[in-house]
């Protein structure tokens, strides 16, 4: 699902070579004339979007953005406390996700597998030229400090199991400072 808008000029330039279901011109014309979609949409996606928007409205957009920033700052502090390096440089860091370079000797698939299988924590890998070199932690949406505490507790245990020296509880303590 995607929310989008296009200019009148872009609408005029829409060509007739299209797929049946993703016929953007047909969608727009149907919405203008009948206020509905041309085909049966994925109703659960609309309901999920509605719920997500209601949650943002309830929390307040500014509060949501501030919370995401606070979670991002706590994540970055926890990463540094473990002696790990951020990717990219912190000046370019996002408040939606944090990428972390693996320490030398820690292998991506093994690290993420242990996190998932032993601790039920999933972190994302990377793509392209940094695939296998970094992992990513998301901290937006309904992510909470409780989620971060559990994630970093699992990261500490996994790094320790893989032979990387970690001061037990250090990253969790760093996160607690932001709560």
Task: Please annotate each region the language model reported.
Residues 1-77, 81:
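Active-site C-terminal subdomain of aminotransferase-like
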Residues 85-118:
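Conserved PLP-binding catalytic core of the aspartate aminotransferase-like
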Residues 6, 100-104, 139:
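Short beta-strand-to-loop capping motifs
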Residues 129, 133-179:
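PLP-dependent enzyme catalytic core of the Aspartate aminotransferase-like
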Residues 115-123, 156-159:
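A common structural junction motif
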Residues 45-48, 52, 64-67, 71-75, ...:
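General structural feature for long, well-ordered alpha-helical segments within catalytic domains
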Residues 83-87, 121-126:
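A short linear hydrophobic-aromatic micro-motif
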Residues 90-92, 128-131:
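A short beta-turn/loop motif at secondary-structure boundaries
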């Amino acid at each position: 699902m995607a929310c989008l808008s296009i200019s009148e000029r872009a609408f005029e330039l829409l060509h007739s070579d299209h797929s049946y279901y993703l016929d953007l011109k047909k969608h727009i014309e149907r919405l203008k004339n009948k206020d509905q979609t041309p085909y049966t949409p994925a109703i659960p996606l609309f309901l999920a979007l509605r719920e997500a928007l209601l949650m943002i409205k309830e929390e307040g957009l500014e509060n949501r953005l501030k919370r995401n920033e606070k979670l991002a700052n706590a994540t970055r502090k926890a990463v540094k406390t473990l002696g790990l390096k951020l990717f990219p440089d912190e000046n370019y860091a996002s408040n939606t996700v944090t990428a972390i370079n693996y320490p030398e000797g820690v292998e991506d698939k093994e690290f993420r597998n242990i996190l998932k299988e032993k601790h039920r924590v999933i972190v994302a890998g990377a793509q392209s030229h940094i695939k296998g070199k970094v992992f990513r932690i998301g901290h937006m949406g309904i992510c909470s400090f409780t989620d971060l505490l559990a994630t970093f507790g699992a990261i500490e245990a996994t790094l320790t199991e893989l032979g990387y020296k970690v001061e037990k509880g250090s990253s969790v303590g760093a996160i607690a400072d932001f709560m």
